[in-house]
Design a protein with these regions (language model features):
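ER/Golgi luminal nucleotide-sugar-dependent glycosyltransferases, focusing on the catalytic module
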Residues: 2-169
Length: 169
């Protein structure tokens, strides 16, 4: 082993996970291919629309949620705990529950469904990227992930954890 290879961290096997829907078009997909397509396995936890999306042809795993079923989001939350029903139902957080506006419940449900499916896979990945299909990737940089760590973008100052891009072990 050369001294240079000792200085380089071992390559981490990566699963690139897309949640939500595949509305982004060709530009985000092509930027994914250019920056990560050869180095990551692709996983989709998405709605059942956009069946002709190129993301589907490249994915190793595809888990779909039937977006036409108005109760699928409630059933997903109930699978975790029915306690959520006792809390105030604020628009943008619990939408589309009981006709409320917003999509907070939807994106959290996609995260939950992704989790439920990932824990069934063999432990072959060192790193997981969580993002959406409507983002353009300008770099192939992914941080080397330490066990028990989650990396999220800095500088957005929104005070929470984003669904737009994070990397974890």
């Amino acid at each position: 082993m050369s001294p240079l290879s000792l200085m380089r961290p071992a390559r981490q096997k990566t699963l690139f996970c897309i949640i939500g829907n595949l509305r982004g078009g060709d530009m985000p997909y092509n930027s994914y291919l250019e920056n990560f397509g050869d180095d990551c396995d692709l996983c989709l936890c998405v709605g059942n629309r956009y069946q002709d999306s190129p993301w589907r042809q490249h994915a190793k795993y595809i888990w779909e949620i039937d977006e036409t079923d108005t109760q699928v989001w409630e059933m997903t939350y109930d699978g975790v705990s029915k306690e959520w029903r006792t809390h105030n139902h604020l628009e943008n957080l619990w939408g589309p529950y009981q006709g409320l506006k917003g999509s907070g419940m939807i994106i959290c449900s996609f995260r939950q469904k992704l989790y439920e499916n990932l824990i069934k896979l063999p432990m072959v990945y060192d790193r997981y990227v969580l993002t959406r299909a409507d983002h353009y990737y300008v770099s192939n940089f992914l941080p080397t992930v330490k066990p028990g760590s989650i990396y999220i973008p800095i500088g957005e100052a929104y005070g929470g954890v984003t669904d737009r891009f994070s990397v974890a072990d």
